[in-house]
């Protein structure tokens, strides 16, 4: 392809102000994407070629394990999502689904995911165990109404995703296929030239018994990964479990009540009373908002040197009630407190806070649900707020009576924690970008959408189901996070828009011009993915653009063309070879094969 006729590069000299991370900056500067609105981007010709190459790698690998490609609608009727009980959660409050009504007033949503639609189709087309297992996938645009779109294609409102769905006759068959997909994903990411790590993950709004995320390790990642050096354990921080450090025991001579004037934080209490945060229980107020406007006030208790993991807390609360939990928010604002609570001793709240602090006129449930982290419940003696302003109290143990009382893991695991009492290995931490997520959904959707099959004995059973996602546009940007330098992008050759770019330094020179056309034609004949920069710009402009857009190889045609010699430059390591034109094709094929075979 020629730059002048097919690929107006549209490179920028200045870094766009809205771009916060290097990959976003380079995508914009190199002309791969153009911002249309917040979280909405146009994929320019170079970017589209990258997307197509990533998609081809995905298709090849999934087809090899028996998956079948299809295309599902993006506009979904609300009725399907109401059957799965996800409509309100995805559209109300901070829900991420764009939704609308048609001319007849019927509700629809723009799909962020396709579990409902594919399960509905499966219920109509799969009726016997003889048809199982089945796996379908698609690659298409998805929509999510992000509260704060940022980082370019990392968190956008419109993006390209591969989503796949499998159906099985048994849990064992699902688990077996899940591992096949996991292995296929590892091959896909290696073929894309990425360094990834698979981690245990929370299933979130998708649901299911277990799930695994695939992370690209990068400093710009929004997710934290906790792992052991040996590789025996790795998990997203939302899911990670560990043992907290040992607490420092309280001394016996501490009085039952401590006067703590104006000491509202754990640090202030510790500094003024010669205490350690591990000896104190902090209590945090949350409101759990369930479907049907059912609001439950929560007292979450955790050791003072630890932090609450709101994802774990959400999941634990969701098990307490048969209603669908829509939202969990920390109660901190004065207006909400004054409207719903009375005589609340902020900064001095204890785990035995009286239910009478909830106002009778409030639309909250009239008793606290108390959730205690293991780090707190394991303490035989501790200090917490005394439920009186300026006072803290020494508790012997969690012995107060409450029918709404639950002990569980609501703690953030952290770097330095041990993974078990049997293992001295400590957790390490690094940042990651999620590019893939796989789930064992079980029968969550088949039960609600009546997707059944007849087994060998003629019994009707619910289908077992898995789902598998890959962020196609995320892969492209994540690849840049791992492959760039001060000059620009350094694409892995497997997903680069072109394998090589030809750069003549002076097309007005007839010798250069003729040699350029000969090389270009020869590469096309040999099915090399080649871009010719045939602009009449200065050589320096072409070199800068070539470095910025990051095509793996450059063929530079300059003054030595009179001797039928050119330079072959490798963008990744900046090595240059001066080669006679009769050896150029052979040398390029050899060098590019080395790069193709060098997967991450």
From Swiss-Prot:
The keyword Lyase does not apply. It catalyses: tRNA(Pro) + L-proline + ATP = L-prolyl-tRNA(Pro) + AMP + diphosphate. Pfam families: HGTP_anticodon (PF03129), tRNA-synt_2b (PF00587), tRNA_edit (PF04073). Its EC number is 6.1.1.15. GO terms for molecular function: aminoacyl-tRNA deacylase activity; ATP binding; proline-tRNA ligase activity. Keywords: Aminoacyl-tRNA synthetase, ATP-binding, Cytoplasm, Ligase, Nucleotide-binding, Protein biosynthesis. GO terms for biological process: prolyl-tRNA aminoacylation. It is found in: Cytoplasm. Consists of three domains: the N-terminal catalytic domain, the editing domain and the C-terminal anticodon-binding domain. This is Proline--tRNA ligase. It comes from Prochlorococcus marinus (strain AS9601).
């Amino acid at each position: 392809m020629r730059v002048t006729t097919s690929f107006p590069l549209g490179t920028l000299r200045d870094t766009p102000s809205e771009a916060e991370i290097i990959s976003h900056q380079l995508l914009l500067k190199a002309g791969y994407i153009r911002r249309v609105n917040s979280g909405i981007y146009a994929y320019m010709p170079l970017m589209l070629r990258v997307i197509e190459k990533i998609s081809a790698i995905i298709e090849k690998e999934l087809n090899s394990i028996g998956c079948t490609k299809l295309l599902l609608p993006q506009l979904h009727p609300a009725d399907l999502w109401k059957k799965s009980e996800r409509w309100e959660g995805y559209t109300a409050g901070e829900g991420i689904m764009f939704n609308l009504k048609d001319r007849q007033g019927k509700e629809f949503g723009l799909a962020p995911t396709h579990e409902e639609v594919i399960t509905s189709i499966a219920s109509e087309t799969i009726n016997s165990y003889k048809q199982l297992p089945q796996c379908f996938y698609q690659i298409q645009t998805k929509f999510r109404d992000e509260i704060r779109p940022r980082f370019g294609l990392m968190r956008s409102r419109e993006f390209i995703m591969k989503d796949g769905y499998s159906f099985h006759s048994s849990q064992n068959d699902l688990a077996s296929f899940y591992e096949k997909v996991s292995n296929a994903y590892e091959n896909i990411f290696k073929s894309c030239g990425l360094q990834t790590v698979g981690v245990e993950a929370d299933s979130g709004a998708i649901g299911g018994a277990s799930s695994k995320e695939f992370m690209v390790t990068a400093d710009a990642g929004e997710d934290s990964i906790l792992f052991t050096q040996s590789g025996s354990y790795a998990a997203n921080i939302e899911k990670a479990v560990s043992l907290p450090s040992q607490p420092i025991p309280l001394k016996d001579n501490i009085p039952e009540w401590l006067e703590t004037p104006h000491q509202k934080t754990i640090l202030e209490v510790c500094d003024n009373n010669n205490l350690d945060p591990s000896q104190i229980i902090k209590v945090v107020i949350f409101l759990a908002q369930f479907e049907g406007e059912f609001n439950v006030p929560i007292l979450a208790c955790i050791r003072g040197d630890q932090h609450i993991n709101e994802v774990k807390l959400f999941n634990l609360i969701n098990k307490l009630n048969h209603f669908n939990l829509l939202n969990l928010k920390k109660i901190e604002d004065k207006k909400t407190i004054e409207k719903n609570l009375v005589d609340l001793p902020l900064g001095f709240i204890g785990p035995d806070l009286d239910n009478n602090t909830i106002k009778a006129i409030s639309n909250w449930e009239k008793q606290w649900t108390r959730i205690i982290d293991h780090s707190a419940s394991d303490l035989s003696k501790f200090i917490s707020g005394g439920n009186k302003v300026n006072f803290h109290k020494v508790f012997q143990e969690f012995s107060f009576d409450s029918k709404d009382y639950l002990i569980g893991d609501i703690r953030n695991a952290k770097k330095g924690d041990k993974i078990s009492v049997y293992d001295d290995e400590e957790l390490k931490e690094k940042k990651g970008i999620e590019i893939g997520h796989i789930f064992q959904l079980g029968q969550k959707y088949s039960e609600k959408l009546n997707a059944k099959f007849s087994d060998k004995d003629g019994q009707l059973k619910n289908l077992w189901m898995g789902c598998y996602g890959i962020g196609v546009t995320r892969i492209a940007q994540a690849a840049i996070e791992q492959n760039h330098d001060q000059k620009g992008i350094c694409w892995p050759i497997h997903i680069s828009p072109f394998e090589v770019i030809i750069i003549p330094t002076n097309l007005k020179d007839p010798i250069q011009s003729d040699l350029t056309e000969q090389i270009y034609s020869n590469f096309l004949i040999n099915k090399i993915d080649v871009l010719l920069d045939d602009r009449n710009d200065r050589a320096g402009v072409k070199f800068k653009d070539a470095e910025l857009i990051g095509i793996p190889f450059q063929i530079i045609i300059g003054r030595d063309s009179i001797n039928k010699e050119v330079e072959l430059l490798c963008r990744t390591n900046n090595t240059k070879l001066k080669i006679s034109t009769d050896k150029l094709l052979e040398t390029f094929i050899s060098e590019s094969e080395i790069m193709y075979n060098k997967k991450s």
